């Protein structure tokens, strides 16, 4: 009888571990998706920053230096 109880306990533990493992896997998948979205947003922001810096650089090249130079 004790062997049956131990087997039941082990089966129950395995079922809980399977559920926990699946929940953790779901979290990891969602985190990976979030990371990918954030990487795309950072790349877009870098591109916009480079564009703005290019515009500022072009405008600054046409101006004469200040009188104190």
Curated annotation (Swiss-Prot):
Spans through the membrane: none
Name the UniProt record assigns to this protein: Protein SlyX homolog
Pfam families attached to this UniProt entry: SlyX (PF04102)
Matches recorded under InterPro entries: SlyX (IPR007236)
UniProt-listed NCBIfam families: PRK00295.1 (NF001421)
Organism this protein belongs to: Pseudomonas aeruginosa (strain ATCC 15692 / DSM 22644 / CIP 104116 / JCM 14847 / LMG 12228 / 1C / PRS 101 / PAO1)
Record PANTHER family: PROTEIN SLYX (PTHR36508:SF1)
Entry superkingdom: Bacteria
Family membership: Belongs to the SlyX family.
């Amino acid at each position: 009888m004790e062997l049956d109880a131990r087997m039941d306990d082990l089966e129950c533990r395995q079922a809980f571990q399977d559920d926990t493992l699946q929940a953790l896997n779901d979290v990891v998948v969602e985190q990976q998706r979030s990371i990918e979205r954030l990487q795309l947003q950072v790349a877009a922001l870098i591109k916009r920053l480079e564009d703005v810096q290019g515009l500022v650089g072009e405008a600054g090249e046409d101006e004469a230096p200040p009188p104190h130079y």
